[in-house]
UniProtKB/Swiss-Prot annotation:
<dbReference type="Pfam" id="PF02782">
    <property type="entry name" value="FGGY_C"/>
</dbReference>
<comment type="similarity">
    <text>Belongs to the FGGY kinase family.</text>
</comment>
<keyword id="KW-0808">Transferase</keyword>
<dbReference type="InterPro" id="IPR018484">
    <property type="entry name" value="FGGY_N"/>
</dbReference>
<feature type="binding site">
    <location>
        <position position="246"/>
    </location>
    <ligand>
        <name>glycerol</name>
    </ligand>
</feature>
<feature type="binding site">
    <location>
        <position position="245"/>
    </location>
    <ligand>
        <name>glycerol</name>
    </ligand>
</feature>
<feature type="binding site">
    <location>
        <position position="411"/>
    </location>
    <ligand>
        <name>ADP</name>
    </ligand>
</feature>
<dbReference type="GO" id="GO:0005524">
    <property type="term" value="F:ATP binding"/>
</dbReference>
<feature type="binding site">
    <location>
        <position position="16"/>
    </location>
    <ligand>
        <name>ADP</name>
    </ligand>
</feature>
<keyword id="KW-0418">Kinase</keyword>
<dbReference type="GO" id="GO:0004370">
    <property type="term" value="F:glycerol kinase activity"/>
</dbReference>
<feature type="binding site">
    <location>
        <position position="267"/>
    </location>
    <ligand>
        <name>ATP</name>
    </ligand>
</feature>
<keyword id="KW-0319">Glycerol metabolism</keyword>
<feature type="binding site">
    <location>
        <position position="83"/>
    </location>
    <ligand>
        <name>glycerol</name>
    </ligand>
</feature>
<feature type="binding site">
    <location>
        <position position="310"/>
    </location>
    <ligand>
        <name>ADP</name>
    </ligand>
</feature>
<protein>
    <recommendedName>
        <fullName>Glycerol kinase</fullName>
        <ecNumber>2.7.1.30</ecNumber>
    </recommendedName>
</protein>
<feature type="binding site">
    <location>
        <position position="135"/>
    </location>
    <ligand>
        <name>glycerol</name>
    </ligand>
</feature>
């Protein structure tokens, strides 16, 4: 047994490789950003070959800079941006089109057409746990087949393969030998029946997707195949853990108990609550998804997704040019006592849960002569907490109980002002763990469990520890007034681009 597990964390803006030891210590990290492609308004793409080269490059780099040898690696785990859709030629390995990213809204018109069939829309929700939305993979595959010359003909001949990013990476790591996904990633395609654990023929046929394109669905923790580290004649290392980024974060936060929840503050915000073996269908705009599948035992989760979370700070930095570094946002936000009545609604690509409005667009409200740069920066930061609170409120109603505490992770969870405001506006205890690399850690856990590197979930759970706790300080009247202002702002951006 080797001394380490490697997590490959393929995100929306960068690819990372992180080496963990048995005590969950980070031995080494390598990261590389890659190109964001915006061909038209509301469209977002990545180059699949750049996803692969950046991911494989950081794997080689982290091994080199830590002097960890391939035979010291027990397993590789993969976590990935979900829903992002890649279609490639199985004979040449060449993508037929760029990866269509989860944020991309190009299929909104396809979704509108599908929504006209009320019975079908209800069928999708009842069987996939998802809502009909351009966010998920299904309509993205349809778009590629309908719009890329020759794609549909090739697909119908069995020459094209579909995969979310996990599938693409495993296929590349195994030199095209293995075409698989796991339960969690399959559950984000809008094509997978999460009750019966199978690709849903009714939905696939409605979208005109040949079943030969679809990967085999496996557990989130099992050996899928091996990759050669160290070139020809190198060490064969098992790829043995795989789950979507948010499910990995839930697992990395050791939210193993029914009712436990976490929020990841990344490019978007993603709130997940473990509902155990119960498939809870939301009445409040959340989606139902698979939390994890181990030994063919499925656990479900309620999920709320915010499309623009930490990305609003990138916008403040890159487009407004109010700050030089994302970390500066806290410094400038603290220069004012409050938002001064200013609200930023960052609906740049529409609104996710619980609103699901593809046509909403971003706006700044409440500006006066006294409003300055710092108020806007603070309002942008606060928008992340307001959107999270919308999800918490919906989740409490669906689950029938208020969350006692919220475990947090992701880059923006290091922002003390944001975390305190989250506790205040949500009237909830916010807990930040010592290890905030919970997404990568979750992938490492899943891979390690499959090969006996860690013995059990119980062993893993004992390792979770709090770095900082934030308790609510707002009076009820203040909290309600601020939330009312937020709701007012959101109501004004809905349907803007219709």
């Amino acid at each position: 047994m080797g001394k380490y597990v490697v997590a490959l964390d393929q995100g929306t803006t960068s690819s990372r490789a992180i080496i963990f030891d048995k005590e969950q210590n980070i031995v080494g990290v390598s990261q590389k950003e890659f190109t964001q492609i915006y061909p038209h308004e509301g469209w977002v793409e990545h180059n699949p070959l750049e996803i692969w080269s950046s991911q494989y490059g950081v794997l080689q780099e982290v091994l080199a800079k830590t002097n960890v040898t391939a035979d010291e690696i027990s397993a590789i785990g993969i976590t990935n941006q979900r829903e992002t859709t890649i279609v490639w030629d199985k004979n040449t390995g060449e993508p037929v089109y760029n990866a269509i990213v989860w944020q991309c809204r190009r299929t909104a018109s396809i979704v509108d057409e599908l929504k006209k069939d009320d019975e079908f829309a209800e069928y999708v929700k009842a069987n996939t746990g998802l809502l009909l939305d351009a966010y998920f993979s299904g309509t993205k595959i349809k778009w590629i087949l309908d719009n890329v010359e020759g794609a549909r003909e090739k697909a119908e001949k069995g020459d094209l393969l579909f995969g979310t990013v996990d599938t693409w990476l495993v296929w590349k790591l195994t030199n095209g030998k293995v075409h698989v996904t796991d339960y969690t990633n399959a559950s984000r395609t809008m094509l997978y029946n999460i009750k019966e654990l199978r690709w849903d023929e009714k939905i696939i046929n409605k979208l005109g997707i040949p079943t030969s394109m679809l990967p085999e669905v496996k557990n989130s923790s099992e050996v899928y195949g091996h990759t050669n580290l160290g070139g020809v004649g190198g060490v064969r290392v098992p790829i043995s853990g795989m789950a979507g980024d948010q499910q990995c974060a839930l697992f990395g936060q050791t939210c193993f108990e029914k009712g436990s929840a976490k929020n990841t503050y990344g490019t978007g915000c993603f709130l997940l609550m473990n509902t155990g073996e119960d498939m809870v269908l939301s009445k409040n705009g959340l989606v139902t998804t698979i939390a994890v599948g181990i030994n063919d035992k499925i656990e479900y989760a309620l999920e709320g997704s915010v499309f623009v979370g930490g990305a609003v700070i990138q916008w403040v930095r890159d487009e407004l040019q109010f700050i030089h570094d994302a970390a500066d946002s806290e410094y400038f936000a603290k220069k004012v006592e409050d938002n001064g009545g200013v609200y930023v609604v960052p609906a740049f690509v529409g609104l996710g849960a619980p609103y699901w409005d593809m046509y909403a667009r971003g706006a700044i409200f409440g500006l006066t002569r006294g409003a300055n740069r710092n108020h806007i920066i603070r309002a942008a930061l606060e928008s992340i907490a307001y959107q999270t609170n919308d999800l918490l409120t919906a989740m409490a109603e669906d689950a029938g109980c208020k969350l006692a505490s919220l475990r947090v992770d992701g880059g923006a969870s290091r922002n003390d002002l944001l975390m305190q405001f989250q506790a205040d506006i949500s009237n909830t205890q916010v807990l930040r763990p010592i290890i905030t690399e919970t997404t990568a850690l979750g992938a490492a856990y899943l891979a390690g469990l499959a090969v006996g590197f860690w013995e059990s979930k119980e062993e893993i759970a004992t390792k979770w520890a709090i770095s900082k706790s934030y308790g609510p300080t707002f009076e009820r009247a203040k909290r309600e007034k601020l939330n009312k202002g937020w709701k007012n702002a959101v109501s004004r951006v809905k349907g803007w681009a219709e």
